[in-house]
Amino acid sequence: MVKLAFPRELRLLTPNHFTFVFQQPQWAGTPHVTILGRLNTLGHPRVGLTVAKKHVKRAHERNRIKRLTRESFRLHQHALPTMDFVVIAKKGVADLDNHTLTEALEKLWRRHCRQSQSC
């Protein structure tokens, strides 16, 4: 049976992890969300989230966006290539409802899958 947990090793935790992705990223984006990715050698994907206060003013909205993004990653982690991902929320993402945001994230995960040609 496939585990759908979200343990610590599936997260980008340090600034060095984020810098690694920002150096040579493959990107996929919508007007509201961008996902940068870079291949890693760990054998499993990892994710980091950036939701700027400048783009999403209210803390509960930032938390909602992060919660939905983590859940989307958790459900798709076994179908994703072994990459480090950084999810960047842009202006207007707080206006999306949960269903629309989840669909946008699923579309971007599929796009990264096609770009890496390992899915």
From Swiss-Prot:
SUPFAM superfamilies, sorted: Ribosomal protein S5 domain 2-like
Catalytic activity: Endonucleolytic cleavage of RNA, removing 5'-extranucleotides from tRNA precursor
InterPro entries reported for this sequence: Ribosomal_Su5_D2-typ_SF, Ribsml_uS5_D2-typ_fold_subgr, RNase_P, RNase_P_CS
Class in the EC hierarchy, top level: hydrolase
EC number(s) stated in the UniProt entry for this protein: 3.1.26.5
UniProt keyword Hydrolase, yes or no: yes
Keyword tRNA processing included in the entry's annotation: yes
Annotated GO MF terms: 3'-tRNA processing endoribonuclease activity; ribonuclease P activity; tRNA binding
Keywords: Endonuclease, Hydrolase, Nuclease, RNA-binding, tRNA processing
GO cellular component, as recorded: ribonuclease P complex
GO BP, sorted A to Z: tRNA 5'-leader removal
Domain of life: Bacteria
Role played: RNaseP catalyzes the removal of the 5'-leader sequence from pre-tRNA to produce the mature 5'-terminus. It can also cleave other RNA substrates such as 4.5S RNA. The protein component plays an auxiliary but essential role in vivo by binding to the 5'-leader sequence and broadening the substrate specificity of the ribozyme.
Similarity comment text for this entry: Belongs to the RnpA family.
Assembly and oligomerization: Consists of a catalytic RNA component (M1 or rnpB) and a protein subunit.
NCBIfam families: rnpA
Name recorded for this polypeptide: Ribonuclease P protein component
Source organism of the structure: Sodalis glossinidius (strain morsitans)
Name of the encoding gene: rnpA
